[in-house]
């Protein structure tokens, strides 16, 4: 078996010499992936999948490395690093270079093996995807997780459909049937549905299996033609469903060793048209068994108890099997090599008996039983039977005994003749012949019982005494020795048992049952009387060997005696290691071909023959160390010569000293249960067991006490280390404190210097800030002055415009009055002319004229009233704006004064602090006191200002009330004038005196209100306004007086004009 380590290579050859898989295991190559980092580790393969041709496979490990293995071209390539474990793979897409991989983050990605680029990225699952099934056309794919299955279009990589289920019913598997358009969905409640791929219409549902054989399905497999469905679970039963008839047609029971089925897959055949007959069944023990569904026979199996299989994939053409092993490696098997024995042609009908060489013939060798078996011909339904014919030779006596008959049709005598002729058995059939010679019962149940007892206490630390490189070989040796110790207690105390068993364990490491039974048979037959003087070497057996050596080579024995070399040195090392230390593998196998084919005394004679054949180098040895080295190492000795010498000794040794007279004949192990082995001094073994138990208990007590002492010592050492660490830490802290103190002093000096520089910078900034504030104040005052001057100019312009408009209106009114007077004059003449003719018409006309005049006067008075109101409103607005500006200016002056005062105090404080730095604390307290006083003064000043603001607000409200009263008086005056005009129009000769009185009252009322207003405004003006405010107020009063005088003149003129028509009428 070849083994390939991928290492850190991204490409390379899979095997370096042409693979020749053995029929026994069929392994082409074993692929492992070890990293060559600082801490080497094994990267475990998790999934494997074949492409459509079957000559390429893809595999991913638990770190996300994905490799493509070309079995036809003998190349591997690293095609992708996903940086996370893959949970499922698919390599049979429409585009042959693309593959699908399901990752641990629940996503599915499509990569290209040629360009090594990402083709698409599909998301939608919320749990791990454990299955990817691709349609036969490669157009669709189904990804399955525990909670959902999703159908994808591989042309657009878009999800077409999604299968949702209840949370209580999980999904086991959803997959396409081969060569059809049907989807099969299998759920955890054993329900199986078939769906149409295009329409997702439910085609049928398989019925429930019988209750007597009901199992929970977990794994499924379908034949290539899609007709048969195999299902299995946590049982050794397999259910076979016919999907055409939709019924369960067969239940196959696996061997009792199978308790659960982990994986199922049919083995394709090129000549079965898709109706596969061989089914691979992977069970819980890691062994994949291939059975024929028709005959229910086990054809072959892969994997073992030590190298179990976790998952497998079979190529579409059925040539290769790729298996992920439990240790994380990848094994590739050749199906042709595994089925070589099955596909062998039938044995020939005629057999030829060949004569042995003449010097080997004897009368007992001429009689042979030839049985022609049954010949199977596929074209014929009948089986022809052949009778057994016996070829006999007329010789005296019946030389063949029943004791020479062996299982499986073998004969011990014929095997001995064959062995003498060729010197050894054929390598291909050696194990088979050994099993027949030793008549091994293969007690699986009894051996499993011994194995189930676990590792024996005596062999728990076997690797310390015998450090074996192969861990598998060490485990097999440990299990075999433990089984022997559980079989008989003597073997737990036998120190040389590992040496005796090791060559057989190495030879039968893949079949532990055969290994155990071979060693047990060897101990019962070829190790007779070895344990009678336990724990000493078998003195009686060594005495037999010494007697035979004394008979055949006295000189060599005398040489041993002269140099104080006993049989425990020249015989016992060979026996306890069964010659494995002094012979090569081929020599050892050839020797044991002869040992197992002869009487148990043959082993003892072999020890004598080995010494006799090595007499020349032994006679040249004089030191005991040289003798010990000779019997523990390989020597340049022909094993064929030794075997011939053994046969010579067996024939020429006298009966009285021949070991066969003292040893029993061969006895095979019993069938079903192993025999009891008690050929040892039981009281010694029991005493040793008790003593060993007592010593073990004493050792445990000693170990506990030593552990306690070690714990106490560890605590003391830990406390000492902690104390030393504490003292060191304190010393370091002290030094660090001194360093920090020096650093603090330096930092304080730097801080003082920085503070001085900062104080100087602050002073400079304060001076700059004062200059800037002063400049800003001057700029703001100038801006306010400019705005106020502009406002005054605007007010002057507005007043001028108003005066001009009033003059124009008055002139227009005068012209209107003159025109009216002319009209009246003309009317007067007309009235006087027509008075006598039409008094009534004249009176009517006069009344109409009087109404028109009254309406005109009302309109003019209304317009005049609006003009007066507009003037008063503008005057009030002007006064309000002036007052607000004055208040803001006063507040700005106060804020500036306070800031100047505060800056002056801060400057005084800075000068005082610079003069007396030593009294910093006292000055700070004084500053805080002064600051409190300043704050209190500011609060008081603020309260005063607020009080003054409230007084001003009150005076403002009073001014507004006075203005409202003035408006009301003017309105009342106008109403009185209008009423007087109306009354005058009705009766011009009466009530002239009251009107004059009212005129005086109305003229006096506004003046009084204005005087009151002036008297109310005067005190505040004298208190808070500056000279410019006084000038503004004087200008405003002058303007108001001019407006009042203008109104009086206009009123008097209007009154005079209103009186003229009445006088003329009178």
UniProtKB/Swiss-Prot annotation:
GO terms for molecular function: molecular adaptor activity. It holds the Pfam family RabGAP-TBC. It comes from Homo sapiens. Residues 728-861, 914-948 form a coiled coil. Signal peptide: none annotated. This is TBC1 domain family member 31. Residues 1053-1056 are annotated as: Mediates direct interaction with PJA2. Residues 424-599 form the Rab-GAP TBC domain. The gene is TBC1D31. WD repeats lie at residues 33-74, 75-116, 117-157, 158-200, 201-248, 249-296, 297-334. Gene3D superfamilies: Ypt/Rab-GAP domain of gyp1p, domain 3, YVTN repeat-like/Quinoprotein amine dehydrogenase. Residues 999-1020 have a biased composition (Polar residues).
